[in-house]
Amino acid sequence: MPTMFIETETTPNPATLKFLPGELVMSSGTRDFPDDEAAAASPLAAALFDLGDVSGVFYGRDFISVTAGPGVDWSQLKPQVVALLLDHFVTGMPLFNGPDASGIAVPADAGEEDDDPADAEIVAQIKELIETRVRPAVANDGGDIVYRGFREGVVYLTMQGACAGCPSSSATLKQGIESLLKHYVPEVLEVRAA
């Protein structure tokens, strides 16, 4: 049986740990499992929720973020999560059931049909900044950010993974992302969680 080591990193969200298996998790996109019902699409996510103390699972390109439920002691949960991840990656089990092979649970462009075609150039600038400046930083913290729309000067975004329940996520949206977008795209007046 091959030897494997899973690295663990803390995230700004104290309830979430980021697990790095040292190999590709998602070939494209990301996947958020905010509850056990959503996790039914993935045997690994379902097994993590079956531990009982897990309240969220998120797959990034080369990491898996696991969020513990309220009051859960990571010193007890972490070895169980690592054991499940090792078993999954060493045995080569599929990440998803059936045709649902990859990508995010909610398409990244969900809500874009509401974008005004007259704002196409502005929306393209916003998406470019999110893709090149924001997503890499958010992924580094064990999460992702998804564009949901631009209406009347307001950019709507969804935080996923470690970022979804993080106490500092609203500060990240307002002070970090909103400041960046307003600086480069003057038409942006505000950023809100969608």
PLM features per residue range, with description:
Residues M1-A194:
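Domain-level signature for proteins that mediate thiol-based redox and metal-cofactor handling
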